[in-house]
Amino acid sequence: VYSIIRGVNGTLRAGSDQLYQWFPGEQGDGSGSVKEMRLAAALNGAFGDHLEDSGNVLAIPMTLVVSGEVIGPEKSALARRLPRASAHPVVFVHGLGLSEHSWNPRGEAGIGEYLDQELDVTPVYLRYNTGRHISTNGRELAELLGRLCANWPVPVESLTLVGHSMGGLVIRSACWYAEQAEAHWLESLKNVLCLGTPHHGSPLEKAGHVLDLALRRIPHANPMAVGRARSAGIKDLRYGNLLDEDWSEQDSGRFEPDARRLVPMLEGVNYYFAAATVGPNEKVLSGKLLGDLLVRLGSATGKHRDELRALHIDPQNCRVFFEKNHFDLLSDEAVH
């Protein structure tokens, strides 16, 4: 997925308008194979903002998925699809360029099924366009969760949100916008789990931005400006933008410092952070520099040199997994 995203350029972006012919069904109707959905998800991660702006059928709408079936948040749809729903829904939010299939990458039972068997919970998966701004997805998720909780087949006693990578940022954004709107579903929110979430950005996006700025200064290199073709969602990962204000006032043609608004964690909600490193411990240089190959430990655990930006989480709720990579957090039994 990430090799596709890093390699995208303007030519591929324009050509995406014709790719819909490869797919037998529209993305919003839940048709098509797992392979096709994974390809569409990768394309959305790469330039989903362009797909949406151009009205392309490949632009993935935000939907809920249960047992592989797209369902609406209406009371009748939820009751029909979830006749044995528990009072404890768990919503899984995938990361950049992925889909709900990322939670069981080998086609086997994943963390959602595991929790369903071991605990009295009902897993629900979010599918969304990861190329859009995180704040755009956050606002829409906040509204969708409101409808989900209001129309859940039984009264919701506890809501748990689980986000992998970008998914954790979308969750935190949704919580912010819901709090501003005094949304009722926040009363049910008890737990937020972030797996490999770049709370303070990803070094890969920072490097992509530097490359873009460098190419702009080289004569005749403009047509090769791969970095400029990055989607809005990818650009948000530079610092971990959560709000509209974090990106709307930024000049993409300049290197600007981190100017994000402070978004504290919600009071009364239990937060859990899981991070990974390819190193055998936190002191090894490879682990410090590479983290899980996409997100460094400090970012995934919420640490920051600026105490105002640091996310102070209970140490008992923060876990580091050694000799694991970014995607091991999705399927490794030790993480589950």
Where are these regions (language model features)?
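Flexible, membrane-associating and regulatory peripheral segments of lipid-active enzymes
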Residues: 1-126, 136, 151
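A Trp-anchored, charged/polar loop motif used as the substrate-binding/catalytic surface
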Residues: 67-80, 106, 144-149, 243-263
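Alpha/beta-hydrolase fold nucleophile elbow
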Residues: 153-164
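Short coil/turn segments at secondary-structure boundaries
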Residues: 103-106, 136-139, 175-176, 206-207
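The conserved beta1-alpha1 loop
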Residues: 91-95, 164-165, 196, 292
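Glycine-rich nucleophile elbow surrounding the catalytic serine of serine-hydrolase chemistry
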Residues: 162-176, 200
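Helical cap/lid subdomain of alpha/beta-hydrolase-fold lipid enzymes
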Residues: 32-36, 40, 48-51, 176-336
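Alpha/beta-hydrolase active-site loop
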Residues: 132-151
